[in-house]
């Protein structure tokens, strides 16, 4: 069933434009509240309570107030955490035994975008069925709760402290970060007052950048999607590592002392190696269609099965649950360790990488010795709306030729964009010139 508002990661858009307007968000809070209330009544749980967290965008205040009004109008109690990473909201929702959690964030997008994302009582993303129920409720007229049945709202002061302690609890008790200097880039986002405490309290010397949010500078020149300042600061301070999070701190990028950047594909490999070195069985891991082939081949050579999900951490999570595995991720830095947290968490992922390095006594470069990422060439080709690339004869003929010639030493991925009339042509090969050659040949058939 197609949905009108919910995408693969909640509802997102430009602030002030539908659907990210205060009137719609109020109705959204009411609709979600009605669905939660019906569920609570059916299970005899009484009045539901939700947690609302947000990142540091200026529009967060406006949307928080609208959500609060909608939920309380539906008879739902509300707790508000203030700025808190998305995975922090997921954790507290589960830890406080709440009915649901809501995050106001547009992740790595600029400040003028925002979004709404829901978590279930278990800290997981809402099932499609529940999102569809909320959309159906949005189409109905609002019927407010009686005056004596309205919800109550209050702020909780210890949300950040609770989450800091939870993050630290995922780091092995017999390890510490004494003697390490770490640069942290919080993207002027939700981790700005969280991440420095986590790593400092575990013993590291911390240098913080991207930690002065003003409501309009989130992700602007800082964070996981713009690592140049992290690379510069890591070199300048002679740090052992640099860690970058995005605006809501659910993704991670890492820089070593030489300024080399490590993406999520490589970090997933590091986490698998750490488990195997500790004697833990790792039957398989999940990446995406975009995960570098070198990582897949390296894992398979060690007997670790590798499955590719559609792009998006939601789909990685689905595959992990289907196979009963624990570790997955994508190159953008969304990493999942399901025995540590129910959702992707940049801080916790960083701690797992650090634990691997401390336990082994190796650097990232040493752990990844022998894993040489294949060069990738990506070309975006504009096409007519509704274009079916699978029925394009010239493209299919060129595709057969390129796949035959690559013959296991590379791969081709062709997929349409989900947001614009574009077909993405990506070729991966051990030789960069070869990747470019085949990508250009394939793209030329569409031009």
Swiss-Prot record:
The record ties this protein, via Pfam families, to: PGM_PMM_I, PGM_PMM_II, PGM_PMM_III, PGM_PMM_IV
Entry PTM: Activated by phosphorylation.
Annotated active site: 107
Relay the cofactor remark from the entry.
Binds 1 Mg(2+) ion per subunit.
Oxidoreductase found in the keyword field:
no
Its GO biological process terms?
A: carbohydrate metabolic process; peptidoglycan biosynthetic process; UDP-N-acetylglucosamine biosynthetic process
- The EC number of this protein is 5.4.2.10
- Please provide, alphabetically and separated by semicolons, the GO molecular function terms listed in this UniProt record: magnesium ion binding; phosphoglucosamine mutase activity; phosphomannomutase activity
Q: Provide the binding site for Mg(2+).
A: 107, 246, 248, 250
Known role: Catalyzes the conversion of glucosamine-6-phosphate to glucosamine-1-phosphate.
Q: Which family does it belong to?
A: Belongs to the phosphohexose mutase family.
Which named protein is this? Phosphoglucosamine mutase
Where does this protein come from, organism-wise?
Ralstonia nicotianae (strain ATCC BAA-1114 / GMI1000)
Q: Give the organism's phylogenetic lineage.
A: Bacteria, Pseudomonadati, Pseudomonadota, Betaproteobacteria, Burkholderiales
Gene name?
glmM
């Amino acid at each position: 069933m197609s949905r009108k508002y919910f995408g693969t990661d909640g509802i997102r858009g430009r602030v002030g434009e539908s659907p990210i307007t205060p009137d719609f968000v109020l109705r959204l809070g009411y609709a979600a509240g009605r669905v939660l209330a019906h569920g609570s009544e059916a299970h005899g749980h009484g009045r539901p309570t939700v947690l609302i967290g947000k990142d540091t965008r200026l529009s967060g205040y406006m949307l928080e107030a609208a959500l609060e009004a909608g939920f309380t109008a539906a008879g739902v109690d509300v707790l508000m955490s203030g700025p808190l990473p998305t995975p922090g909201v997921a954790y507290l929702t589960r830890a406080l035994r709440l009915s649901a959690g809501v995050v106001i964030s547009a992740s790595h997008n600029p400040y003028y975008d925002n979004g709404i994302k829901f978590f279930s009582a278990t800290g997981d993303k809402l099932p499609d069925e529940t999102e569809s129920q909320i959309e159906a409720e949005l189409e109905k007229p609002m019927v407010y709760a009686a005056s004596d049945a309205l919800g109550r709202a209050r702020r909780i002061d210890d949300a950040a402290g609770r989450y800091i302690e939870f993050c630290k609890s995922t780091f092995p008790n017999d390890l510490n970060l004494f003697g390490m200097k770490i640069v942290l880039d919080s993207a002027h986002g939700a981790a700005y007052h969280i991440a420095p405490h986590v790593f400092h309290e575990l013993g590291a010397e911390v240098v913080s950048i991207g930690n002065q949010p003003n409501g309009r500078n989130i992700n602007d020149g800082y964070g996981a999607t713009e690592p140049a300042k992290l690379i510069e600061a890591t070199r300048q301070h002679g740090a052992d590592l640099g860690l970058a999070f995005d605006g809501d701190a659910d993704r991670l990028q890492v820089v070593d002392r030489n300024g080399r950047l490590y993406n999520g594909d490589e970090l997933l490999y590091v986490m698998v190696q750490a488990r195997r070195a500790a004697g833990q069985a790792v039957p398989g891991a999940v990446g995406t269609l975009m995960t570098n082939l070198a990582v897949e081949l390296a894992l398979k050579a060690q007997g670790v099965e590798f499955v590719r999900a559609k792009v998006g951490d939601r789909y990685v999570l689905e595959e992990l649950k289907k196979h009963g595995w624990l570790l997955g991720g994508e190159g953008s830095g969304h990493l999942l360790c399901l025995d540590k947290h129910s959702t992707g968490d940049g801080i916790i992922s960083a701690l797992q990488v650090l634990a691997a390095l401390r336990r082994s006594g190796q650097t990232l470069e040493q752990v990844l010795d022998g894993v040489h990422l294949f060069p990738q060439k990506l070309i975006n080709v504009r096409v007519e709306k509704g274009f079916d690339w699978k029925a394009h004869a010239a493209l299919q003929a060129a595709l057969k030729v390129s796949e035959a010639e690559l013959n296991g030493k590379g791969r081709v991925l062709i997929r349409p964009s989900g947001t614009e009339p574009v077909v993405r042509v990506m070729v991966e090969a051990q030789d960069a010139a070869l990747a470019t050659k085949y990508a250009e040949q394939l793209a030329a058939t569409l031009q």
